[in-house]
Regions:
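Conserved helix/coil segment N-terminal to the catalytic DExD/H
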Residues: 80-111, 122-126
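Conserved Walker A/P-loop ATP-binding site and its immediately adjacent core
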Residues: 31-33, 42-68
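Walker A/P-loop
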Residues: 14-37
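N-terminal pre-P-loop "Q-motif" helix
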Residues: 1-16
Length: 223
């Protein structure tokens, strides 16, 4: 509630095109929080909302959570018809799909007051900011460090609000205390990027492949 109150203070006190970044650890409930923000915003502001994600799985998951909060929303994918867009106050989309729809002038965003960017540290979202020059941008992420060292997040956001830490979330029973186990796995396919960390692409390719997921399941069953 404290985070939501802070964010709504910015809605009231800051310019309508303000860019705010909100950080909360993984598992802290970012989707729940911004779904409640959308619900309250639509009631208060009477403007439309766009929620951006970077993966189709997150797109569908976000749409479901928004629906659970009573927010009538539409997923904008490559197959979706937008003839009924006037019936919706909230749209959920991935970057490339929305970019193509906007370039083709298929989606009316003239009444969009708020854009929420999930996993905002991914730089692919920046290409869409030009379409929402008059909208309030709310980025949410667990890691407020840009995926590209040459494109720092300070270039796109005016302020950072830091949420509760992992230890605070555990203490307040929002997160469970983790039991940690380690296994030796091959990491030779990981590529080090310009910022000294492994690239997002090589990490996703390694940790989401079937062999790695099978090892994860086996490790869980052994414990």
């Amino acid at each position: 509630k404290g985070a939501i109150d802070k964010i709504f203070e910015r809605f009231e006190d800051c310019p309508s095109d303000y860019h705010l970044l909100y950080q909360l650890p993984t598992g802290g409930g970012k989707t729940i929080i911004f779904s409640e923000i959308v619900r309250q915003y639509l009631k208060l502001k009477k403007k439309k909302v766009v929620v951006l994600t970077h993966r189709i799985e997150l797109c569908n998951q976000t749409s479901k959570v928004l629906s659970d909060f009573g927010v009538l929303n539409k997923v904008v994918n490559s197959k979706a018809s937008l003839d009924d867009q006037e019936q919706y106050s909230c749209f959920v989309a991935m970057v490339e799909t929305l970019n193509n729809r906007l370039l083709d002038d298929k989606l009316d965003i003239s009444d969009v007051g708020l854009v929420i960017i999930d996993e905002a540290h991914y730089n692919s979202f920046t290409k869409l900011l030009k379409f929402f020059s008059s909208s309030f941008i709310l980025g949410v992420t667990a890691t407020p460090l840009s995926s590209n060292i040459n494109l720092p997040m300070t270039d796109n956001y005016d302020e950072l609000i830091v949420g509760e830490s992992i230890s605070e979330l555990i203490k307040n029973n929002f997160l469970a205390r983790a039991n940690l186990y380690t296994y030796n796995v091959g990491l030779t396919s990981l590529i080090v990027g310009a910022n000294g960390d492994y690239t997002v692409k090589s990490s996703e390719e390694l940790y989401t492949n079937n062999d790695m997921l099978s090892k994860l399941l086996l490790a869980y069953e052994e414990r």
